């Protein structure tokens, strides 16, 4: 199965609006038992999340996984920092890619692949307001063209 495919649990649509994605990479997430149950129930939010590399390890920060209903004392803090599973070569590549100005690691989507939770990280550069307007304008033009073609084909 190619990267980014599987049973999609959560998507970060705002990331594609706020950032231009340069490259993507797939990583596993270290979760506790109650957290994976919440992820399978699609109770995860990526909106404010980002990833960082500290001491040669990748970490997922500010991603909210809601506490599991029947988890009682085993529930973790919903906003806790979670370790990402990447190989050393991938981490060094990410460090080199992030050295550019304005580059960041943004979680694009979380999905289940062969029973494991995976996150698709995007190496992203922030968009300016005028870039966002251009994207919206281009999207509207494509929509208009499709509408015209559809009406001509009828």
From Swiss-Prot:
Pfam families named in the record: SmpB
GO biological process, one term: trans-translation
GO cellular component: cytosol
TM regions (residue ranges): none
UniProt keywords, alphabetically: Cytoplasm, RNA-binding
GO molecular function term, any single one: RNA binding
Keyword Cell division attributed: no
Function: Required for rescue of stalled ribosomes mediated by trans-translation. Binds to transfer-messenger RNA (tmRNA), required for stable association of tmRNA with ribosomes. tmRNA and SmpB together mimic tRNA shape, replacing the anticodon stem-loop with SmpB. tmRNA is encoded by the ssrA gene; the 2 termini fold to resemble tRNA(Ala) and it encodes a 'tag peptide', a short internal open reading frame. During trans-translation Ala-aminoacylated tmRNA acts like a tRNA, entering the A-site of stalled ribosomes, displacing the stalled mRNA.
Family membership noted in the UniProt record: Belongs to the SmpB family.
UniProt-recorded name of the protein: SsrA-binding protein
